[in-house]
């Protein structure tokens, strides 16, 4: 087996690990961790999750035959997030409008 020492910088921290084969458990663990943090930062947009790693680095952690499917699934995920944000914005606008209409119907005696 060919052993290689690799490191990656993520969130201001440097991670060092050994890679024996593209299918080893540590390789898959880092891959899943990056995808999870990417999904959380895109979906929740939390200030506590900072994604400083550029998006182009994520396909580098995948085998060559997985890169096209990863990129297409990432594009699909981004489209879903964009759709959900648009839907959420529309629902908030509807809620504010409905509340304003309901509030305007209350007689001023009760205010």
UniProtKB/Swiss-Prot annotation:
Superkingdom of the source species: Eukaryota
Extra information: Partially overlaps NUP53.
Name the UniProt record assigns to this protein: Putative uncharacterized protein YMR153C-A
């Amino acid at each position: 087996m060919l052993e290689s020492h690799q490191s990656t910088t993520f969130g201001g921290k440097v991670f060092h690990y050994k890679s024996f084969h593209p299918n080893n458990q540590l390789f898959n663990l880092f891959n899943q961790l990056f995808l999870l943090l990417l999904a959380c930062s895109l979906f929740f947009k939390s200030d506590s999750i900072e994604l400083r790693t550029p998006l182009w680095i994520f396909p580098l952690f995948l085998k060559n035959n997985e890169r096209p499917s990863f990129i297409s699934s990432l594009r699909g995920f981004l489209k879903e997030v964009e759709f959900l944000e648009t839907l959420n914005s529309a629902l908030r606008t509807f809620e504010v409008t409905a509340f304003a209409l309901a509030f305007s119907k209350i007689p001023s005696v009760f205010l």
